[in-house]
Amino acid sequence: VAPEPEYIKKMAQLQEGVASCVSTFTQAAATEALKSTACVDQMVADYTRRRDILVDGLNAIPGITCRKSAGSFYAFPNIKAFGKTSQEFAEELLKNAGVVTVPGSAFGDMGEGYLRLVFANSDENLKEAVRRIADYVTRAYPNMK
């Protein structure tokens, strides 16, 4: 920037405030936000409910087992019973059920045989995803128990 000399002083003052000082009203807002955990408590309850919708739904599908995570918004179901790589099964779900998952192999050799699903979504979308996966598995793997 090459402003007129009269503007340089004003720009320097603005830059100092932007780069090195948090305004008092912002400090007051941050202090207030830290006083209450109500929004955090609600968020934990929401994610717990969503996790349970997804994981309980997945565990009801023959051939899929899934543990409940305690500290993330991801589910990592075991799909080894289908005899497919995680990449193959993820592609099947995308193509045939319209459900996006991440192959466990993307996280290293120990992730093979698993998929990653995120439950940072609405209850309705999670229920729909479980329904689509269950419908696909029932059609494609009718002998799965």
Please describe what each predicted stretch is.
Residues 1-145:
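PLP-dependent class I/II
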